[in-house]
Amino acid sequence: MPIDGYSSLTQLGRQAGVPANPDEAVIETFANPHPGTNYTVRLTAPELTTICPITGQPDFATLIVDYVPRDRLVESKSFKLFLGSFRNLGTFHEDCTAYIHKRLSDALDAAFLRVVGLWNARGGITIDCVVQTGELPSNCALLPLGRTDYRTGRI
């Protein structure tokens, strides 16, 4: 497959630093090479880090994004840098998960979008947040939710 149509990407293949905050981050997208074909894309970030806005203590999550693209796909380096910009941000788990969903929704206009934040326990309580929009096409499947063991590939 020829590599063309990616000239609008400004971060992939170039030196790019982590933005100071998520509002400054740009989530880049590129043309879906298979428009009209329903398929599910999963992005998993096992090391999302934020700061508790009250205590200043770090919070950690596995972020799972499932989407069925229409015309655009997420460029993964820009998404990684976007997520890195949360490292020093004071935010609650629910707000962070919903904000990531909004930014992806604005960037993609996906047929289906689900963002799941599986937050590590704090004070003995885990918080799992799910924000979902659109209908999953009947010919698409979702992998089970859960933390994947990246060494074995098992959930």
UniProtKB/Swiss-Prot annotation:
Protein location: Cytoplasm
Predominant location: cytoplasm
Active site: C52, D59
Domain of life: Bacteria
UniProt: substrate binding residues: V74, E75, S76, H93, E94
UniProt pathway annotation: tRNA modification; tRNA-queuosine biosynthesis
Gene3D superfamilies in UniProt: 3.30.1130.10
EC number assigned by the record: 1.7.1.13
GO molecular function: preQ1 synthase activity
Keyword list, A-Z: Cytoplasm, NADP, Oxidoreductase, Queuosine biosynthesis
GO cellular component assignments: cytoplasm
InterPro entries reported for this sequence: GTP-CH-I_C/QueF (IPR043133), NADPH_dep_7-cyano-7-deazaG_red (IPR050084), QueF (IPR029500), QueF_type1 (IPR016856)
Pfam families: QueF (PF14489)
GO biological processes: queuosine biosynthetic process; tRNA modification
Entry keyword annotation includes DNA repair: no
Keyword ATP-binding among record annotations: no
Catalytic activity: 7-aminomethyl-7-carbaguanine + 2 NADP(+) = 7-cyano-7-deazaguanine + 2 NADPH + 3 H(+)
Family in the record: Belongs to the GTP cyclohydrolase I family. QueF type 1 subfamily.
Protein purpose: Catalyzes the NADPH-dependent reduction of 7-cyano-7-deazaguanine (preQ0) to 7-aminomethyl-7-deazaguanine (preQ1).
Protein name: NADPH-dependent 7-cyano-7-deazaguanine reductase
Gene name per UniProt: queF
